[in-house]
A protein has these predicted regions:
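N-terminal membrane-sensor/transducer module of prokaryotic signaling receptors
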Residues: 1-145
Length: 145
């Protein structure tokens, strides 16, 4: 099983052992740690949306890509890795994810629940896989240095 398959199943709520892969820490985080914090954020975000029962969700909190654990970790390393293409790609994909989630919140807050659900089911998993690919590439490059 590769990381993309593991992430896709994990986002569906399945408990599966992390695949043997890059076992390296960057700023105190392993690849598994980074992916698990992303999965946790997505899971908590979905729970808030369901629990809201149609009440407005916090748009600013969702859009803030520096407030989640993964985003805080990325921001803490920005000055160190900002010139690395793999880091910039990862940073951008993470920001894209939060922007997409914010657009879904806007749909939800405007009572366009079906559109929000469709977007959440199609866009967020794809962007999560992009983040997984970007994280893996970043870790591999850093490990070689």
């Amino acid at each position: 099983m590769n990381i993309r398959e593991w992430l896709a199943l994990s986002l569906e709520g399945k408990e599966i052992a992390f695949p043997e892969t890059v076992n390296f820490n960057v700023n105190g985080y392993s690849l598994e740690d980074a992916l698990r914090t992303h999965i946790e954020w997505v899971s908590n975000w979905k729970k808030k949306a369901i629990a809201s029962k149609g009440a407005p969700l916090n748009l600013d909190e969702t859009r803030a890509d520096d407030r989640c654990i993964l985003g805080s970790w990325l921001n803490s390393m920005y000055s160190r890795f900002q010139d690395m293409n793999e880091f910039q790609y990862l940073f951008t994909k993470h920001r894209d994810f939060h922007e997409a989630a914010a657009k879904i919140v806007e749909l939800h807050n405007n009572k366009k629940f079906t559109a929000a659900l469709n977007e959440a089911r199609s866009v967020l998993p794809r962007l999560s896989l992009d983040i997984a690919d970007a994280l893996e590439a970043f870790f591999k490059v850093v490990m070689k240095k």
